[in-house]
């Protein structure tokens, strides 16, 4: 009898509880239908900065409320630096009144969720869209209460130095993408599937990060800090194997809550889909996280993000191998050469096109979803027709986002570049190398549960 997490997953259980056994605050509660026009209950959507419930719109490409977007824009425009009066840098932001909210902690949270200082152009978010009349009163109330919360006491604020104080902690400048779609109202937009994938993926990513931060590799001293302030340490075989085995159940929950087509498959077919997708997931995510976190500078050009808290240096892959006692030196050198070649290919074929395209978050999400349901992964299988239906829905949504979201009249060139990138990701040689080098242990684990 098959045992293990595939027989015990309950999508209503908080993800952190499933994987690391402590209480969580945000379960995946979205409906499982891929085609439903209603993506989420508005009462369950919260700003990623202040954690208040809001209408689900994006500002600067991030799921934050108008008040926090306005706070961030003003803070950058007038070069404000804040001080936490409690001295903890961990203040509660979802307070009764914004006037009592700690602005230092609010600012740090803005940077943590991915808001980019360089995106503030002309004191206005590049993806700013005029709100409809039904939202005007809400916007006015939010911004008025937010204005008063910035504080005029010198105890709260020092306007003499811009953003360098926090950036010094991060230690390097960061190349970040242009924000995402212009008007992603997730309740009325026709692009329901892409938005649903995006919302569930963000929850999936957050839950995986919680797992990583709980593991012992985070106790290393040799850390660097990306744009989010999350510590990143050198990866080893053992670390990566432990991380992916602990996170595997979260992938199943993400797919089951996002795609009806996956939920309808039997256990063995679900395992097959996961096994096929994991190498491609690493390929896309590692390049995208590198694109988001690593600066475009010569000293970082050999670094590739491996997970959210680890990286591999293509010039020091022996460190990744870890303990090689008892192994033949020629075998070690052969693995080193294959890994170096893999990282170079990933950078040239996937990462560089992302930089050239200045890929947006919804395009990354679309690329991810297309590779879950790629034809080569389902040809001749029971899920072949289901995969075709998902791809049709994704392309319809992508058309809508380009036309009505970004307002691009002639988007054929951009769509073509996206499909070229999709083709590179589908490179069979790269996927098989990733599977053999990075996921050989995971495949054995997957089919043993």
Swiss-Prot record:
Keywords: DNA-binding, Metal-binding, Nucleus, Receptor, Transcription, Transcription regulation, Zinc, Zinc-finger. Disruption phenotype: RNAi-mediated knockdown reduces expression of homeobox protein lin-39 in vulval precursor cells at the larval L3 stage. Residues 44-122 bind DNA. One of its GO terms (cellular component) is nucleus. The keyword Transcription applies. It is found in: Nucleus. It holds the Pfam family Hormone_recep. Residues 200-449 form the NR LBD domain. This is Nuclear hormone receptor family member nhr-43. The gene is nhr-43.
């Amino acid at each position: 009898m098959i045992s293990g997490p595939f027989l015990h997953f309950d999508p209503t259980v908080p993800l952190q509880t499933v994987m690391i056994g402590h209480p969580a605050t945000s379960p995946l509660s979205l409906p499982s239908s891929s085609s439903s026009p209603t993506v989420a209950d508005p009462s369950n959507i919260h700003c990623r900065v202040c954690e208040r419930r809001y209408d689900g719109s994006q500002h600067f490409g991030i799921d934050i409320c108008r008040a926090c977007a306005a706070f961030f824009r003003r803070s950058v425009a007038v070069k404000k630096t804040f001080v936490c009066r409690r001295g903890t840098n961990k203040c509660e932001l979802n307070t009764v009144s914004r006037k009592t909210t700690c602005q230092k902690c609010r600012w740090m949270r803005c940077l943590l969720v991915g808001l980019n200082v360089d995106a503030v152009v002309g004191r206005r978010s590049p993806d700013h869209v005029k709100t409809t009349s039904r939202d005007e009163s809400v916007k006015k109330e939010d911004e008025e209460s937010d204005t008063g919360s910035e504080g005029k006491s010198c105890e709260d604020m020092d306007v003499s130095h811009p953003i360098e104080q926090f950036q010094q902690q991060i230690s390097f400048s960061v190349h970040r993408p242009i924000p995402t779609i212009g008007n992603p109202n997730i309740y009325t937009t026709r692009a329901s599937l892409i938005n649903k994938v995006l919302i569930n993926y963000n929850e999936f990513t957050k839950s995986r990060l919680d797992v990583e931060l709980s593991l012992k590799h985070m106790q290393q001293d040799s850390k660097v800090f990306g744009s989010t302030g999350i510590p990143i340490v050198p990866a080893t075989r053992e670390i990566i194997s432990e991380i992916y085995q602990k996170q595997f159940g979260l992938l199943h929950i993400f797919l089951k809550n996002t795609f009806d087509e996956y939920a309808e498959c039997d256990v063995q077919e679900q395992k097959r889909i996961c096994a096929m997708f994991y190498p491609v997931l690493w390929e896309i995510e590692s390049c995208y996280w590198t694109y988001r976190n690593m600066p475009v500078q010569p000293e970082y050009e050999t670094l590739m993000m491996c997970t959210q808290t680890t990286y591999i240096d293509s010039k020091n892959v022996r460190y990744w191998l870890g303990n090689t006692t008892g192994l033949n030196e020629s075998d070690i050198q052969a693995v080193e050469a294959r890994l170096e070649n893999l990282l170079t290919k990933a950078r040239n074929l996937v990462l560089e096109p992302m930089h050239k395209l200045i890929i947006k978050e919804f395009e990354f999400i679309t690329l991810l979803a297309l590779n879950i349901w790629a034809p080569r992964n389902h040809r001749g299988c029971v899920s072949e027709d289901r995969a075709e239906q998902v791809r049709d829905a994704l392309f319809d949504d992508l058309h809508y986002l380009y036309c009505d979201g970004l307002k691009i009249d002639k988007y054929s060139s951009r769509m073509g570049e996206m499909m070229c990138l999709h083709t590179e990701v589908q490179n069979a040689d790269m996927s098989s190398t990733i599977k053999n080098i990075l996921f050989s242990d995971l495949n054995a684990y997957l089919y043993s549960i």
